Each structure stands twice: as structure tokens, then as C-alpha cells.
């Protein structure tokens, strides 16, 4: 701005000089040309600062305090978060003309483009160079101005265009990843079908535990070891994220060992995982809560070691089992924080009501009152043991049936987590 001031002063002085020159008729034309030439140069130069030519505005609006922050805290936040950020990148991808060039694509063009934005080198939140600026973090970019939707689970989250990130953008605090042993049992690949696994780019580390570690490091860089850690939601840092790990491979023992030693250990070392304190017999909540589901091991010596003091012999258990809600007993209250079952499994406990429920689902797209009551009792039993509840496998088509069943699960049955594939739709309920 001082250069603009100097130039304006120069123009005024030039104008006065030219006025004096103009008093002489012989120099009148020269004076006019001089003024015009100077004004043309100033206008062209000033345009680069006031956007006359369409360039970015370069006026300085910073205050004294922020100017001392320095370039170490610069960041590339677009100012769009949540669903708006998703729509921005989807629209940007739709403008792409060349769809044949696959060079450099890893997960997908869409995913890769979003990740490049989230992890840009000038994000300013990395602690690698000693900087600490949570406002420029991935959490800030994804979830600022996003309200947490506490009663929703992102079903088959790994199938989404943006595994993990899409759920966070919608404020969903529960996700899941199906894992398979690959590469001679040295890695866990993520996917629903073993035939379509991508060992290189779709692993538990690349899609989930790696991004989570980065995000949590960025927002906790100002905290001490004993401080309670901030989570992945900007407006609700105390909210834990449920991370379901669905065991798919037959060798559950090896899957568990690899999960603990390779994928969860960095998160544990930083104090980011919820754990069960075996001495105090209580749950200590942290930013991420890992829940084992599917074909997980049930042998206590596998889960907690030979001495039954936790996998790392620290009297802490860093994973919880997804308790079977349809065949629940009290011992799950010490090893679980959630209970799940399919709708059919729960209806199977309703004596002669199962067939009637099936007919009602086909005709009316909803459960009859008797079936709702029966399922609700099983949910209440789990809740009485201190467990959150989730029902999976409910019909999702036609649309009218899905809406009715959502309403019954939330308001009539009292489920804690609604299992859904439609994240954007469910946030508007």
C-alpha cells in the first residue's frame, strides 16, 4: 500500500508541474501528454493490486498480531467444509474433460484429488518442522461448521467414494472397514470381496489408521501427554469415533496380531485409543474407539495374552467386541461397548412373529406393532448392560419402506446407531 501512496503523490506532483508548464502555451500539449502517460502507467500498475485486470486482490488486511504468525502457519483452507466441500470436488471432477489418462491415479481421481488438498504441504498443521497450527488441519478442513449426527453408523464405509472422509464431512461418528490378510499375511487390505482387493492403495493404514493418526497429531500438537486428546470433529472434539474392524479372513488370530502390532500401535502410543482399564474395571474414552466385528477371535489368551493383562501386558484392553445382541449375556458388559444384530436375527427371537413381520415388510414396508415391541425389548436388554445398539440388514428399498423403518428404529425401538448407506439423506432427518 505504501507504494500506491508514493505513486499517487508522484501523480499529484506531476500534475502541479504540468499545470505550471501549461501556463506557457508552447508547452500545453506536452503537459497534457505527460499527464496522460503517467496516469496510464499508474492505472496499469495499480490494476495488479486492486483486481482491475482480474488478478487476486493483494491489499493487506492483516492486523499486527496475525502478521507476527509468519509463513509457518500458512494454510490452503478453501473455506468450504462438510457436504459443501464434497460437492465442490464432485463438481470439479465433472468438469474434467480427459477421462482416459490414468497416470498417477491410486485410489481414484476423486479420492486422490481430495487427499492432495487435505494434505497439501502448506497446510501448516504438520509438526514435522516444529509448526503447530490446528486451524490449518485436516479436521478443520473437513468438519468445521459440521454438526455431529450422534445416532448414525456409516455402513460399508470403505465402499464410499471417500472412505472415512465422507462420513466425517457429514458428522457421522461411526465407520467400518472389512479387512483381509494379504501379501503372505503381512498386510490388511480393505474391501468387501477378496477378488477385488487393492493391496497397494486400499489398506487399513492408507484409508483409515494412517489418516486418523495424521489428523489427531495435527489437532493435538499443543497438548501435553496427560491432557485429554481432541478428536476428529472440529465442533465436538470430545466425541469419539467408532472404528469397526470387520474380520474377513479365516485366520482371526493372525489378523488380530497384525492389527494390534502394525496398525493400532501408533495410535495407542499417542494415547488416541479408548481402552478398558482392567484394574479399575472402567472404560477410558479417547478420540477413537476400535470395535472388532465379524470373525474376530474370542479366545481370552489371544485377546489379552497368556497372563490376561492385556495384549501389551499393561492391564489395558484397546479393542472392544461387537456383542451379539440376539444372543446376549452379561459377560459382554466387560468386553464390549456396543451390541449389534441383523433385523432377521432379532425377529428370530420373536417366537411366531417372524413370518408376520416378513409379510408386513412386504405389504406395508414397516414392522407390525408386536414385532417392534419384541425387538425393542432386546435393544433395551443390551442398553441395560451399558451397551450402545445397532441393527443391520433392514430393507432399504423401496424408498418409502426405508424411511418407515428408519423412523421405527429411532423412535419406536430406540436404537442407538442407525445403520445406513445414505449419509447425506440421514443428516436431514
UniProtKB/Swiss-Prot annotation:
SUPFAM superfamilies given in the database record: PLC-like phosphodiesterases
GO annotation, biological process: lipid metabolic process
Transmembrane segments: none
InterPro entries on file: HAT_RTT109-like (IPR051236), PLC-like_Pdiesterase_TIM-brl (IPR017946)
Keyword Signal found: yes
Entry keyword annotation includes Calcium: no
Record key words, sorted: Signal
GO molecular function, one term: phosphoric diester hydrolase activity
Protein family membership: Belongs to the AIM6 family.
Protein name: Altered inheritance of mitochondria protein 6
Source species taxonomy: Eukaryota, Fungi, Dikarya, Ascomycota, Saccharomycotina
Gene from which this protein is expressed: AIM6
Amino acid at each position: 500500500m505504501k507504494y500506491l501512496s508514493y505513486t499517487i503523490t508522484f501523480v499529484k506532483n506531476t500534475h502541479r508541474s504540468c499545470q505550471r508548464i501549461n501556463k506557457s502555451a508552447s508547452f500545453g500539449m506536452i503537459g497534457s501528454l505527460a499527464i496522460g502517460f503517467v496516469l496510464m502507467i499508474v492505472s496499469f500498475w495499480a490494476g495488479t493490486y486492486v483486481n482491475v485486470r482480474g488478478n487476486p486482490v493483494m491489499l493487506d488486511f492483516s492486523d499486527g498480531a496475525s502478521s507476527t504468525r509468519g509463513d509457518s502457519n500458512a494454510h490452503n483452507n478453501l473455506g468450504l467444509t462438510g457436504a459443501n466441500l464434497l460437492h465442490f470436488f464432485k463438481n470439479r471432477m465433472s468438469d474434467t474433460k480427459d477421462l482416459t489418462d490414468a497416470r498417477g491415479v491410486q485410489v481414484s481421481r476423486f479420492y486422490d484429488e481430495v487427499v492432495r488438498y487435505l494434505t497439501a504441504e502448506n497446510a501448516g498443521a504438520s509438526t514435522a518442522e516444529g509448526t503447530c497450527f490446528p486451524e490449518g488441519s485436516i479436521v478443520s478442513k473437513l468438519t468445521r461448521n459440521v454438526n455431529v449426527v450422534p445416532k448414525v453408523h456409516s455402513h460399508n464405509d470403505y465402499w464410499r467414494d471417500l472412505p472415512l472422509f465422507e462420513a466425517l464431512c457429514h458428522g457421522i461418528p461411526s465407520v467400518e472397514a472389512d479387512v483381509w490378510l494379504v501379501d503372505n499375511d503381512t498386510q490388511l487390505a480393505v474391501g468387501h470381496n477378496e477378488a477385488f482387493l487393492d493391496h497397494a492403495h486400499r489398506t487399513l493404514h492408507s484409508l483409515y489408521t494412517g489418516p486418523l493418526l495424521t489428523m489427531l497429531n495435527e489437532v493435538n500438537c499443543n497438548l501435553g501427554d496427560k491432557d485429554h486428546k481432541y478428536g476428529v470433529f472440529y465442533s465436538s472434539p470430545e466425541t469419539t469415533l467408532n472404528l469397526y474392524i470387520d474380520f474377513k479372513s479365516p485366520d482371526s488370530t493372525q489378523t488380530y496380531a497384525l492389527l494390534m502390532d502394525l496398525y493400532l500401535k501408533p495410535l495407542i502410543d499417542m494415547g488416541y485409543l479408548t481402552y478398558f482399564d482392567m484394574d479399575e474395571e472402567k472404560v477410558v474414552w479417547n478420540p477413537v474407539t476400535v470395535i472388532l466385528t465379524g470373525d474376530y477371535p474370542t479366545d481370552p489368551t489371544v485377546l489379552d495374552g497368556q497372563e490376561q493383562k492385556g495384549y501389551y501386558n499393561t492391564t489395558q484392553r484397546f479393542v472392544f467386541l461387537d456383542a451379539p445382541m440376539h444372543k446376549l449375556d452379561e459377560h459382554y458388559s466387560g468386553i464390549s461397548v456396543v451390541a449389534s444384530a441383523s433385523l432377521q436375527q432379532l425377529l428370530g427371537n420373536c417366537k411366531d412373529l417372524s413370518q408376520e413381520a416378513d409379510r408386513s415388510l412386504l405389504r406395508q414396508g414397516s414392522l407390525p406393532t408386536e414385532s417392534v415391541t419384541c425387538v425393542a425389548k432386546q435393544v433395551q436388554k443390551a442398553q441395560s448392560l451399558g451397551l450402545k445398539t445397532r441393527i443391520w440388514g433392514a430393507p432399504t428399498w423401496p424408498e418409502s419402506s426405508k424411511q418407515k423403518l428408519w423412523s421405527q428404529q429411532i423412535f419406536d425401538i430406540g436404537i442407538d446407531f442407525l445403520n445406513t448407506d445414505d449419509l447425506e439423506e440421514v443428516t436431514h432427518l
